[in-house]
Amino acid sequence: MTELNGIRVLVTGATSGLGAAMAAALAAAGARVMVAGRDEARAKTAAAELGPSAIPCQLDVRDERSVVACIARAREAWGGIDMLVNNAGIGMRTVNPRFMSEPQPFWEVAPSGFRDVVETKVVGCFLMAREVVPLMLRQGGGRIVNISMNEQTMVRRGFVPYGPAGAGVEALSRVMVADLAGSSVTVNILLPGGATRTGMIPDEVPDEARAALLDPAVMGPPDRLACLRRRRRRARPSHRRDRVQRGIGDAMTALASASPT
């Protein structure tokens, strides 16, 4: 499949879970993909699995110097970036390993854990977009897709700092849209639904509990997403919040190929 015909896509947090599924779907549809992640070895392995159209990049989205270096690597390899997928994130299990069975009140959350989640998700989105947008404006256009969560998760009991981080991404995305109005750079928010097999959920959580997080009509398990049939769907990549249908791989290729009007 060459639906995306060589467009240049940088995916953060692309070494596992949803990020890996998005990278695989994009590569299968013909995109050139930069697989970015904190662990250099995992990034190299993940990129190798996607084939010659993918290149790895070690990236800590919280670190401005790391962000600048990763964008520079993409420019050196491709000459530009057509699409940025801000997917990198840290789940609740790093703050409270038993968050599903024993919600932790916000006043018991360690400040260091709060900062780590928020800096990875919100500050990371900001730093990546801040570095990429001037490049996209100079080249005549581009797309940014910020991965967030549904509103119910944002305000769920015991979901500090994960919920506030998602809310921050949504607010940041809306400001990006306003600031980029009239340009050819578009911004979307993608809401994937339950992350049941991505490392976000503790290993001891039973399958029944995982199943409750995942609506088959909305999203498939991550290891199946790259195999789903991708359909080209027109989208309006501006103010809309996109809900994944038939798998996040479908949604990502749809956004990548949609008309910018």
Where are these regions (language model features)?
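The beta1-alpha1 cofactor-binding region of Rossmann-like NAD(H)/NADP(H)-dependent oxidoreductases
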Residues: 40, 59-71, 111
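Catalytic loop of short-chain dehydrogenase/reductase
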Residues: 90, 102-113, 143-168, 173-174, ...
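Active-site Tyr-X3-Lys motif and surrounding loop/helix of classical short-chain dehydrogenase/reductase
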Residues: 69-76, 95, 100-108, 112-119
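A short, exposed helix-loop element centered on a Lys and neighboring polar residues
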Residues: 129-130, 174
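Conserved glycine-rich cofactor-binding loop
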Residues: 15-16
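C-terminal helical subdomain
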Residues: 182, 189-191, 208-249, 253
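Conserved glycine-rich Rossmann-like NAD(P)H-binding loop of the short-chain dehydrogenase/reductase
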Residues: 31-45
